[in-house]
UniProtKB/Swiss-Prot annotation:
One of its GO terms (molecular function) is nucleotidyltransferase activity. Kinetic data and structures suggest that the magnesium ion plays a direct role in catalysis. This is Choline-phosphate cytidylyltransferase. The gene is licC. Monomer. Forms dimers in LicC-CDP-Cho-Mg(2+) crystals, but the monomer is probably the biologically functional unit. GO terms for biological process: cell wall organization; lipoteichoic acid biosynthetic process. Its cofactor is Mg(2+). Mg(2+) binds at residues 102, 211, 213. Maximally active in neutral and alkaline conditions. Cytidylyltransferase involved in the biosynthesis of the phosphocholine containing cell wall constituents, teichoic acid and lipoteichoic acid, which are essential for cell separation and pathogenesis. Catalyzes the activation of phosphocholine (P-Cho) to CDP-choline (CDP-Cho). Can also use phosphoethanolamine and 2-aminoethylphosphonate, with much lower efficiency. Shows lower activity with dCTP, weak activity with ATP and no activity with GTP, TTP, UTP, dATP, dGTP and dTTP.
Length: 229
């Protein structure tokens, strides 16, 4: 079991905080966001960790010595969405977590006993243009829709078993060959082909994970953490 952390982006909506710092290295309680993820993974014995870097990539170098992670450079980080980041490490997808680096994890939700492809999901209200999971009592994902409502969303943490990963890689290769991937997120490979995939939902408590997508999100997280202490 391994983990792929997507950390190549510009973090434009977090400016000015990301003018000189990658979003994944923005500090929360005096620790970079990505270090919470790495340490939680290692707590569960998941030590093979690949970080896709791009913007200000040299700032991630210290993580190699501190945690023994692997860094992969996405030289197209300013041109494409995260589809290309996953394309670069597609052969690593089997039996791997895929994690968005802009998530603050309140607790360790990682499991080292997963055997099936899983989207970890929190319930959110008043969402705008969010990706929602549609599933039944068996927790198998039937559809992924983009909507503005309340419900369980893609939360930036997923796990992919080998058979599902093999299919996703074929979808990635097809999209790459077509050249029509500039605006794609890697999750489009799942969303657009969900009827061919066996993917399940792991429901998380609402206070498990928090996406930092803007300065307002960051300030809100600061308030949440202050009230917890």
């Amino acid at each position: 079991m391994k983990a792929i952390i997507l950390a190549a982006g510009l973090g434009t909506r977090l400016r000015p905080m990301t003018e000189n710092t990658p979003k994944a290295l923005v500090q929360v309680n005096q620790k970079p966001l990505i270090e919470y993820q790495i340490e939680f993974l290692k707590e569960k014995g998941i030590n093979d960790i690949i970080i896709i870097v791009g913007y200000l990539k040299e700032q991630f170098d210290y993580l190699k010595e501190k945690y023994g992670v692997r860094l992969v450079f996405n030289d197209k980080y300013a041109d494409y969405n995260n589809f290309y980041s996953l394309y670069l490490v597609k052969e690593e997808l089997a039996n791997s977590y895929v994690i968005d680096a802009d998530n603050y994890l309140f607790k360790n939700m990682f499991r080292n006993d997963l055997t099936r492809s899983t989207y970890f999901s929190v319930y959110r209200e008043d969402c705008t243009n969010e990706w929602f999971l549609v599933y039944g009592d068996d927790y198998k994902v039937q559809d992924i829709i983009v909507d503005s409502k309340a419900g369980r969303i893609l939360s930036g943490v997923s796990f992919w078993d080998a058979p599902t990963a093999e299919k996703i890689v074929s979808f990635i290769d097809k999209a790459y060959a077509s050249g029509e991937f500039v605006d794609l997120y890697w999750d489009n490979m799942v969303k657009d082909n969900i009827k061919e995939l066996d993917v399940y939902v792991e429901e998380l408590e609402g206070n498990s994970i928090y996406e930092i997508d803007s300065v307002q999100d960051y300030r809100k997280l600061e308030e949440i953490l202050k009230n917890e202490n």
